[in-house]
Amino acid sequence: MSTNVADLLHTIKNNWCDRSILVVGDVMLDQYIWGDVGRISPEAPVPIVRATHRTEQPGGAANVALNIARLGARATIVGFTGTDDNERALKDYLSSNRVEADFVSCEGFPTITKLRILSGRQQMLRLDNERAESRPSTAYQKLIERALHHLPQSDALILSDYAKGVLLPEVCQTLIQAAAQRKIPVLVDPKNVDFSRYRGATTISPNLGELALAARVDLENLNDLLYAAQQMVRNLGLSFLTATLGEKGIALVTRDKTTISAAVARQVFDVSGAGDAVIATLSLSLASGLDPELGVHLANLAGAIVVSKVGTAPVEQYELLNALTAESVPVAQAKVVTRSELLELVARWRRNDERIVVTNGCFDLLHVGHISLLEQARGFGDRLVVAINSDRSVRELKGNSRPIVGEQERARVLAAIAAVDAVVIFDERTPLELIEATRPDVLVKGGDYAVSGVVGAEEVQSWGGHVKIVPIVEGFSTTKLIEKGH
């Protein structure tokens, strides 16, 4: 894996936009009803969910195509749908996200839809509407014709198989052979246990459970599984196989070698859609000429990003770029962000239904009182943002002898504290503008302030947020430390 980070960043930003990926497979619509649980039903021992809002987005193969588009490339999706409102909703969503949807509509078959009911980050129930069986032969003929029509303009082909009746063996083999004639790489995300239908593909990307079922090997015996994967590479004529191993990472398996790309540490909220992000990223890597090892590394980063989100959600190009950049800098430094970067982070945290806490101050000569404040502030929510006054702002407030420690050094020290998720520097006299931009759920201030005296308190309370005053640790302050030093 010799390519440096700068080259990879350049490839993602400037090469992927010229790539075109064809996805064929089981398209779905994922629907979500979000709500709050306040009590148990008197009719049965089940929670009552009070619905607050509803969302929907592409799932299955359609989510693979969406990931490709969000990563900056062109995507075309071919698959079966019904002739219903969900088919139109799916087409509209994809079209608005620059995905060309070429669906074969089948009478008597619904558009596959999965409705999930969630409270907070907890999934309460899932309802599936589908007919997972073969369509008429004429439908398969149309599907193959449309896929072959798009193939010459494609840089890679993905077969996204959710075992819902689209990718029959004859469909897979027709498309794999056509792609091979044009030297177009074929990537398969399998759900069927019979991998022989994917013979001749460039790579198959099963998860650990899928690999165990296909190989008929005990899930707990990783060495035997990876040996079986090597046999599959040989027997199926693959270039390589990639197996997602959950917390262990992703294994890249060739005929005579296995390399494991370690998992990226992330807080896991929802694993749905991770495999879609992995194969979308891997397809773009191969289509742009990167070697498989680099492709697996990028796919690993993409999967880690997606599992940190709630629900089926694609990986964004900027998220992959940020993750790749963060690898080349210390973790603490990566937590020091600009205002625009902070707003992107806050937006992502909100999509995950995370509670955001903001505190602010000069934080000059960090001491135990500061640490106590930060640890208590973190306890009020899921993410803690620390906003610090710039050097110019500190001088305006404290005089020309301050700060003792420069803004960049103060920011780096704060970022090294585990309780802190992001540090941002503001140049204004007060953090009001930043508070209004981030709209925190909780605003925390240390000291003996009245809530009414806290900058931003009125604004935070106006949108339903809370203001918390944390008592100071007696005997510790920056001023006293300076006096003691003198």
Curated annotation (Swiss-Prot):
EC number assigned by the record: 2.7.1.167, 2.7.7.70
InterPro entries, sorted: Bifunc_HldE, Carboh/pur_kinase_PfkB_CS, Cyt_trans-like, PfkB_dom, RfaE_dom_I, RfaE_dom_II, Ribokinase-like, Rossmann-like_a/b/a_fold
Region (Ribokinase), start-end ranges: 1-331
A family per Pfam: PfkB
Catalytic activity: D-glycero-beta-D-manno-heptose 7-phosphate + ATP = D-glycero-beta-D-manno-heptose 1,7-bisphosphate + ADP + H(+); D-glycero-beta-D-manno-heptose 1-phosphate + ATP + H(+) = ADP-D-glycero-beta-D-manno-heptose + diphosphate
MF-aspect GO terms: ATP binding; heptose 7-phosphate kinase activity; heptose-1-phosphate adenylyltransferase activity; phosphotransferase activity, alcohol group as acceptor
The protein's annotated pathway: Nucleotide-sugar biosynthesis; ADP-L-glycero-beta-D-manno-heptose biosynthesis; ADP-L-glycero-beta-D-manno-heptose from D-glycero-beta-D-manno-heptose 7-phosphate: step 1/4; Nucleotide-sugar biosynthesis; ADP-L-glycero-beta-D-manno-heptose biosynthesis; ADP-L-glycero-beta-D-manno-heptose from D-glycero-beta-D-manno-heptose 7-phosphate: step 3/4
Binding residue positions for ATP: 207-210
BP GO annotations: ADP-L-glycero-beta-D-manno-heptose biosynthetic process
Domain of life: Bacteria
Segments of this protein annotated with the region Cytidylyltransferase: 358-486
Quaternary structure, from the entry: Homodimer.
Protein family: In the N-terminal section; belongs to the carbohydrate kinase PfkB family. In the C-terminal section; belongs to the cytidylyltransferase family.
Function: Catalyzes the ADP transfer from ATP to D-glycero-beta-D-manno-heptose 1-phosphate, yielding ADP-D-glycero-beta-D-manno-heptose.
Family matches, as PANTHER family: BIFUNCTIONAL PROTEIN HLDE (PTHR46969:SF1)
Protein name in the entry: Bifunctional protein HldE
Species of origin: Koribacter versatilis (strain Ellin345)
